[in-house]
């Protein structure tokens, strides 16, 4: 009996070896853990964490009908992002008011985002090592410290997750032309909007990806549009 393990492959001598993309994903996850594992010892901050979790009665109640309703109708903290509120409520249900666990959830989302970025780039370009380098920069770049190490910035890592999943679904649509994949991409985009509105620019990004590397827009059509505006 043989086991189907997609992260393994056989060489010409029938010897098992681990696929390089699986190894890269493992290394990327370890790098994120090395850089951000320390957040487990961090506390809540006095900047926005109170509004988002610490003294927010709707969040502290966890997943109740009233709290869920509140998440979809409130513009508390000058934001409408019900999915972000719901994620904080789920944290309360799972970990209570343990700040380290809330921080580690952000780290988990960042790991998922890093792996998704690598898989998206590798799938689109078929350049595995260049994709790995870009994903590594994304994983450990200091610009992401605020988004990962600050509980109130859950909306950033959550929005990014939906954006990458939406791109992946769109790539499936490009490959298969099945409308279900396009609908999935749109649904994930809507979840991103309900996490943080900055994802609103995603359709423009998809158009750019259509040009390169998906090559769905021929160069001659770009020239025609350019000539029209001359």
Identify the residue ranges that each predicted region occupies:
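Polytopic membrane enzymes that build or remodel cell-surface glycoconjugates and lipids
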Residues: 1-230
